[in-house]
């Protein structure tokens, strides 16, 4: 796995030697960032269920101002730190080793993010709750992206408006904006 574009293009990212982590494929990550390109420069990004950190590192490489990585697995959080170090990234990020829902609850609404990227385990029980919590931290013109199994259709909280689905193999990227912003927004 490598950083696809930007300042750290071509840098190798370590992948886990243990089961249970499903890193976003290079192809799907490239598709995602081609869509997000106009939103990345200077953005405040939250990478939830960060795993290897590949998605957040890609955002940093492409000019995000700050990335908050949230990952509850200690080995994965250490892997994120290692990947950041291997890429030579010395700042512009925070790694939080915590359960994503609890970490979202602990953040203040003033802590708004321009992009929230969530890649929960496909068998997670309550995507609705996580989407609801994340929506409270989304900037008024922000975008929330959920990577999910194509076969699993998420229930969507009323404060979010679904604007796009991008399918790739067994995975789908579902994109949301705040429902109150949906009338005046340009969609990704």
List the predicted regions and their residue ranges:
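Class I S-adenosyl-L-methionine-dependent methyltransferase catalytic core
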Residues: 1-188
């Amino acid at each position: 796995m490598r950083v696809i574009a930007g300042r750290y293009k071509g840098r190798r990212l370590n992948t886990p030697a243990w089961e249970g982590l499903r890193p976003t494929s290079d192809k799907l990550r490239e598709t995602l960032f081609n869509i997000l390109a106009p939103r990345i420069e200077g953005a405040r990004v939250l990478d939830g269920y960060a795993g290897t950190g590949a998605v957040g590192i890609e955002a940093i490489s492409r000019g995000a101002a700050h990335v908050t990585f949230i990952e509850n697995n200690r080995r994965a959080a250490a892997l994120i730190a290692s990947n950041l170090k291997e890429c030579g990234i010395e700042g512009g990020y925070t790694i939080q080793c915590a359960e994503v829902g609890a970490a979202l609850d602990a953040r203040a609404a003033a802590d708004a993010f321009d992009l929230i990227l969530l890649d929960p385990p496909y068998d997670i029980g309550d995507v609705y709750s996580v989407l609801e919590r994340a929506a409270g931290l989304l900037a008024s013109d922000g975008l929330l992206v959920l990577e999910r199994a194509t076969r699993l259709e998420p229930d969507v909280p009323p404060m979010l408006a679904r604007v796009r689905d991008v399918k790739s193999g067994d995975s789908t990227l579902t994109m949301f904006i705040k429902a109150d912003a949906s009338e005046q927004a340009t969609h990704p």
